[in-house]
Amino acid sequence: MSDTATYTPRLRAKYTETIRAAMKEKFGYANDMMIPRLDKIVINMGVGEASQDSKKIKGALEDLEAITGQKPVKTVAKKSIAGFKLREEQVIGAKVTLRQDRMYEFLDRLITIALPRVRDFRGLNGKSFDGRGNYAMGMKEHIVFPEIDYDKVEKIRGMDIVVCTTAGNDEEAKALLAEFDFPFTN
């Protein structure tokens, strides 16, 4: 076997070694399976101009693949909307669902590298939870990720990032993400 078989992402190790114990102590869970954990991270990049020119989606797919290390899935319009010149089944964006090690690696890069590079960054809004333990945030520029070469980018795009947890409510989810060093402002 190679060394990669024993590799554990930094945040996964932090979760198993310190975060689980801290969460169990703070909320008093009866057993270890009740402790919230990260389930998945979904990254969505909408490409509205792809409805006019289908070649525009290619750059978004390549950038999303470079950022996540996983091939994105094209998202299509569910129904036609004449006002937006949109047809049903037309490609309008791309998304990636990250789980396991790739999820922890992406989260590590997001917290330690990408968020500090965001212009005028003052922290994340602590009220962007959905009531069921999931946190959603938006980024206006995808070039803050180190995998993106600024000179080769045809257009700066935004992206939506949703962090899904197994927490039952927002309080537990916020405590979990705060343990992962999410820079919440409130």
Swiss-Prot record:
A GO molecular-function term, please? Answer: rRNA binding
GO biological processes: translation
Keyword Ribosomal protein present in the record's keywords: the answer is yes
Tell me yes or no: is Lyase among this UniProt entry's keywords.
Answer: no
Residue ranges annotated as transmembrane are: none
Gene Ontology cellular-component terms for this entry are: ribonucleoprotein complex; ribosome
| NCBIfam families the UniProt entry points to | PRK00010.1
HAMAP family tied to this protein: Ribosomal_uL5_B
Query: What is this protein's function?
Result: This is one of the proteins that bind and probably mediate the attachment of the 5S RNA into the large ribosomal subunit, where it forms part of the central protuberance. In the 70S ribosome it contacts protein S13 of the 30S subunit (bridge B1b), connecting the 2 subunits; this bridge is implicated in subunit movement. Contacts the P site tRNA; the 5S rRNA and some of its associated proteins might help stabilize positioning of ribosome-bound tRNAs.
Q: What is this protein called?
A: Large ribosomal subunit protein uL5
